[in-house]
Structures are given as C-alpha cells and as structure tokens.
C-alpha cells in the first residue's frame, strides 16, 4: 500500500487592511513643589488574524514612570552648626589669610627699621666719642666750656687716663734712641757692624743691652746716694771669679731664663721698695774697652753668656 502525502485544502478570503487603534492616557499629579510624578500609559491592540483554518489574537500594554527631585539647602535660621554668611562679604577666608601675611611682613619691616636706626645711632655715638677724644686730648679741660659735648661727663675719667698715658709715653720716649722707619728690626747697631759674623742671638743681645741702658738712665735720675752702689762691687767680684774659673766653663743661660730672672728681681724690688741691684753694671764698659785678646782666653759658653747679657758686642 502506497501512502500519499495529504495536502489540506485552504480557501483564501480577500479582505481589507486592519485598522490600528492607539489609546494614550497621561496623568500628572503634583502634590508638593519638591517632587513631581509623571506617568504615561499606552495601550496598543493589534488586529486579529482570522482564517478559515486558524484564528489568532494578540494584545500588548506598556507603562513607564519618571521621578525628578529638586535639591533645596536647609534653612540657616536657628541652626548653630551652619554659618550664616548672608551678611558677610564674599572671600572672607582669603581676606583673613591675606591680613595675617601682611601683618607678618609689616612686623619684619618695623623690626628692620628699628634695628638699623639703633645701629646707626650707636655707630655715630662711638665715632663722635673717638673723634672728640682725639681732638680734645690734652686740652679738653680748657675747651669743655666752649663746646657742648654730651660725652664729656661720661668720659672724663677715660680722658684723664689717656692724658697720664700720653705723659708717660712722652717721658719714656726721651730716652729712646732714634730708629730708622725703614728698618723693620729697628736695630741701630746693624750699620756699625765690624765683622761678617752673623749670630742668631744678636737681636736678643742688642735688645737686652738697649733695655738695660734705658733702665740705667731711669735709675740714674732717681738715685743719688753713693751707698747704693754696692751692686757694682758684687758684679766685679763675680767677674773676677769667672776669669779665675776658665777651666770650668759654666752653662750658658737662655734668654728666657734671664728674662724671668730680671722680672723676678723687678718684682722683688717693687715689693720691698728697694732699688738695690738695679744700678747699671760698671764692668760692662770695662769689658768693651778690654782688648780683643781677652776673647781668646774665654770659653765659648762664657762668651755667649756675655753676649746675651749685653756685656759683649759682636
């Protein structure tokens, strides 16, 4: 048995195009000024498709809603946590910061002006005092009534001290030898050199000799009693003992030891108010007038000691 395909018969009926009906409903409800609700509803119905064999019908409905909110700041009335800036200008923070920075700069400027004024005044005061001291030194007592100097009262004691210092310098300069301004060593015996021998102790010996000569001049002014010349006799005895003990040369004393000894003797005489031993030694002149053969009989250490003490001239 052969099975054949069965094809149903369909009868088509001609008809017109369907009509489309759309219904739109919109409702707006406004309850408060702070919110608004908009709702739209649309309903659409599709035409139904009918046929002799099949019959179908369909429908669709859609709805949408949108909520829009408006922001409003809270009221500042009676609220302690919110700054009421309605009565304040704009940029209050910037104005405050600028005022603080300006105050700092103004304080620095005032400090600089005050310090410069004080330093200038101090400098002028010192310079005027020094100028007046140099100008009126020695005769400020006679010219104080002619000029009004505000520093005379405060510096009277210093002026008197300067006068005494100048007088003492004048007295000491009377006994000083003339020195060449072009010689940095200020040695008056360099031009009178009689040999080519150069000694490292020459400057020390010449200085000690000149110092002893000035000291002898000062002592000769105030000492007139011949009974005080006992020191010369002691020096002569020591010189004789040195000549006898040529076989036992003594150790040469350094300039520092001699200087300390002189200073100690001066302190002793100042404490006891005595001038014994400060008389110039007469044997120094006798050694200079002695013949040169005496140097050959002396030991080198003794000769160096005499040079350091100013008794010998190279």
Curated annotation (Swiss-Prot):
Sequence ranges of Basic and acidic residues compositional bias: 254-269
Residue spans crossing the bilayer: 93-113
Transit peptide keyword on record: no
Protein's cellular compartments: Vacuole membrane
Residues recorded as bearing Phosphoserine in the entry: 148, 254, 274
Membrane topology value: Single-pass membrane protein
InterPro entries documented for this protein: PRM (IPR051009)
GO annotation, cellular component aspect: cellular bud neck; fungal-type vacuole; vacuolar membrane
Domain of life, source organism: Eukaryota
Residue numbers spanned by region Disordered: 32-60, 240-309
Protein name: Vacuolar membrane protein SCRG_03194
């Amino acid at each position: 048995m052969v099975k054949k395909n069965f094809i149903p018969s369909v009868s088509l009926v001609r008809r017109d195009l369907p009509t489309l009906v759309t219904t739109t409903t919109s409702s707006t409800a406004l309850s408060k000024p702070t919110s608004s609700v908009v709702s739209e509803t649309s309903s659409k119905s599709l035409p139904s498709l009918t046929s002799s064999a099949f019959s179908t019908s369909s429908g669709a409905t859609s709805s949408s809603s949108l909520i829009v909110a408006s922001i409003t700041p809270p009221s500042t009335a009676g609220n302690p946590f919110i700054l009421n800036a309605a009565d304040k200008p704009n940029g209050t923070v910037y104005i405050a910061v600028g005022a603080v920075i300006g105050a700092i700069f103004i304080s620095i400027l005032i400090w600089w002006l005050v310090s410069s004024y004080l330093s200038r005044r101090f400098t002028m005061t010192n310079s005027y005092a020094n100028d007046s001291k140099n100008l009126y030194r020695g005769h400020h007592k006679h010219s104080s009534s002619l000029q009004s100097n505000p520093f005379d009262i405060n510096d009277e004691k210093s002026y008197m001290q300067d006068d005494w210092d100048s007088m003492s310098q004048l007295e000491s300069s009377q006994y000083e030898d003339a020195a060449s301004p072009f010689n940095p060593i200020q040695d008056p015996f360099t031009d009178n050199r009689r040999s080519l021998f150069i000694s490292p102790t020459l400057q020390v010996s010449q200085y000690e000799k000149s110092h002893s000569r000035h000291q002898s001049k000062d002592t000769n002014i105030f000492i007139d009693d011949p009974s005080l010349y006992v020191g010369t006799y002691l020096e002569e005895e020591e010189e004789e003992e040195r000549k006898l003990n040529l076989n036992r040369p003594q150790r040469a004393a350094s300039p520092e030891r001699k200087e300390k000894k002189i200073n100690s003797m001066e302190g002793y005489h100042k404490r006891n108010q005595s001038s014994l031993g400060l008389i110039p030694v007469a044997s120094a002149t006798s050694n200079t007038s002695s013949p040169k053969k005496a140097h050959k009989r002396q030991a080198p250490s003794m000769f160096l000691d005499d040079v350091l003490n100013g008794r010998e001239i190279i």
